[in-house]
Amino acid sequence: MVSHRAARRKRASATELYKTCKQSGTCPPDVINKVEGTTLADKLLQWTSLGIFLGGLGIGTGSGTGGRTGYIPLGGKPNTVVDVSPARPPVVIEPVGPTEPSIVQLVEDSSVITSGTPVPTFTGTSGFEITSSSTTTPAVLDITPSSGSVQVSSTSFTNPAFADPTIIEVPQTGEVSGNVFVSTPTSGTHGYEEIPMQVFATHGTGTEPISSTPIPGVSRVAGPRLYSRAHQQVRVSNFDFVTHPSSFVTFDNPAFEPVDTTLTYEPADIAPDPDFLDIVRLHRPALTSRRGTVRFSRVGKKATMFTRRGTQIGAQVHYYHDISGIAPADSIELQPLVAPEQSDPMDTLYDIYAPDTDNTTVLDTAFHNATFTSRSHISVPSLASTASTTYANTTIPIGTAWNTPVNTGPDVVLPATSPQLPLTPSTPIDTTYAITIYGTNYYLLPLLFFLLKKRKRLPYFFADGIVAL
């Protein structure tokens, strides 16, 4: 919107005011004193002129022109120059009588009168004679080239007075070839300079600034300050404010109205909505979230007052419309995606530092449920659940001395199963066995050394060598 400045009217002069207000008696005192010459300066000149002659000097309250005769130098009178107007030749005046014609002819009359072109006469009765002719030879153009070859030659002349000394071969006037780029060789050695090029960003830690003056900190774009004390807050409940905001300011119904730009209006006396009175500008919309709602906002500029210079004075109003509310997020219980592993009593650990309990029943159960594999070791269920919570229990595995699983720290041993492939014997199996004893020595299973049901009495040796049972 282009604001038009109001034309400033010139104030009337003191002389014009004196002519109009003197008759009505409403003239200000300064106007009367200035026109009538009764100001303090005029009175001082009148009083001082009684004893001092100031005539001809032009001392007064008027313009400094030196009086009617101007300034006269002290040395004498100024030289006067008399302007003589150039003499003009007299104009001959011819008297015109009442009988003279009023039409002035530009060309003099001549005594020769032409009769013009003679009219043709026809003597016969048959009219004009028409003569016709016919030709049987076809109009064929002979485009066969004549016998003989065409030779193209070119001649060039070298003039040293008009030739550049750096050019060896003068360019020809024309060439008969398909190449449109014609070059001219020059004489001399063309010098060049090798400039070493440096590769940037090959050394460094990668934290060097990209620009010469990096901006410290993180720069954020400031949002619109719509809720300051300088903005008047007005809530618009009608949804047409989002799609047709001009319907609240003017009565016009435009065919196309952009809703995402700044809208400008002419100041109107009456607005369809009293909240939009004196609105001359609606800024582009902004979507914000305020107290759990999605809010559509526009800032309007009012033109309530206009100065003589054309400046608009008005408040800034924040118009907003709450579109919808933001519901709180629902808490969803997450389920594990991996099925829990089944605990196997054969893959547990045994706590040797647990308090003394009836281990006989536990060892018997583990012995009968044990499955001997190729690793030749067995694990028993842990008794840590029955231990007191005041002790820090340490768990170690129990197995054979030659194949002991290593478990460091509070690691959890998960069950591990190996696939069992079906074995097909090549020959029929004979179920009858022959037991052959090769000697008197035998070995018990290593597991039986640890799974004794009764306590074994250990001999005590004294210092004198006697064994006590």
UniProtKB/Swiss-Prot annotation:
Q: Which cysteines are joined by disulfide bonds?
A: C21-C27
Recorded GO terms, molecular function?
Answer: DNA binding; structural molecule activity
List GO terms (cellular component aspect): host cell; host cell endosome; host cell Golgi apparatus; host cell nucleus; viral capsid
Disulfide bond as UniProt keyword:
yes
Tell where it localizes: Virion; Host nucleus; Host early endosome; Host Golgi apparatus
PTM note: Highly phosphorylated.
The answer on whether this UniProt entry bears the keyword Cytoplasm reads no
Motif Nuclear localization signal per UniProt: ranges: 1-12, 450-458
Quaternary structure?
Answer: Interacts with major capsid protein L1. Interacts with E2; this interaction inhibits E2 transcriptional activity but not the DNA replication function E2. Interacts with host GADD45GIP1. Interacts with host HSPA8; this interaction is required for L2 nuclear translocation. Interacts with host importins KPNB2 and KPNB3. Forms a complex with importin alpha2-beta1 heterodimers via interaction with the importin alpha2 adapter. Interacts with host DYNLT1; this interaction is essential for virus intracellular transport during entry.
Family that this chain belongs to: Belongs to the papillomaviridae L2 protein family.
Name-wise, this protein is Minor capsid protein L2
Q: Which organism is it from?
A: Human papillomavirus type ME180
Gene that this sequence comes from: L2
